[in-house]
């Protein structure tokens, strides 16, 4: 494998994981904070809020997992080598 391609693949994998985690990280923090304030305002709606929160957190986390998959493909099954 060309050393330049290998170095670029490692850098791209690091960027893929790092950038894929930034957006969902902010989104999960914001969603969790809003859920806590919603439960504080309406304690009787805790079940619905928690269920919706967990579903939305799973969808946000899937974006990070996609970034991890792309990084693993670049590192171990490099299509550019």
From Swiss-Prot:
Record keywords: ATP synthesis, CF(0), Hydrogen ion transport, Ion transport, Lipid-binding, Membrane, Thylakoid, Transmembrane, Transmembrane helix, Transport
The keyword Transmembrane belongs to this UniProt entry's keyword annotation: yes
Pfam families: ATP-synt_C
Keyword Secreted: no
Locations listed in the record: Cellular thylakoid membrane
Topology with respect to the bilayer: Multi-pass membrane protein
Domain of life of the organism encoding this protein: Bacteria
Cellular component terms (Gene Ontology): plasma membrane-derived thylakoid membrane; proton-transporting ATP synthase complex; proton-transporting two-sector ATPase complex, proton-transporting domain
Residue spans crossing the bilayer: 6-26, 57-77
Site (Reversibly protonated during proton transport): 61
InterPro entries noted in UniProt: ATP_synth_csu_bac/chlpt (IPR005953), ATP_synth_F0_csu (IPR000454), ATP_synth_F0_csu_DDCD_BS (IPR020537), ATP_synth_F0_csu_sf (IPR038662), ATPase_proteolipid_c-like_dom (IPR002379), F/V-ATP_Csub_sf (IPR035921)
Broad class of where this protein is predominantly found: membrane
Record text on subunit structure and interactions: F-type ATPases have 2 components, F(1) - the catalytic core - and F(0) - the membrane proton channel. F(1) has five subunits: alpha(3), beta(3), gamma(1), delta(1), epsilon(1). F(0) has four main subunits: a(1), b(1), b'(1) and c(10-14). The alpha and beta chains form an alternating ring which encloses part of the gamma chain. F(1) is attached to F(0) by a central stalk formed by the gamma and epsilon chains, while a peripheral stalk is formed by the delta, b and b' chains.
Function recorded in the entry: F(1)F(0) ATP synthase produces ATP from ADP in the presence of a proton or sodium gradient. F-type ATPases consist of two structural domains, F(1) containing the extramembraneous catalytic core and F(0) containing the membrane proton channel, linked together by a central stalk and a peripheral stalk. During catalysis, ATP synthesis in the catalytic domain of F(1) is coupled via a rotary mechanism of the central stalk subunits to proton translocation. Key component of the F(0) channel; it plays a direct role in translocation across the membrane. A homomeric c-ring of between 10-14 subunits forms the central stalk rotor element with the F(1) delta and epsilon subunits.
Identification of the protein by name: ATP synthase subunit c
Organism (species): Rippkaea orientalis (strain PCC 8801 / RF-1)
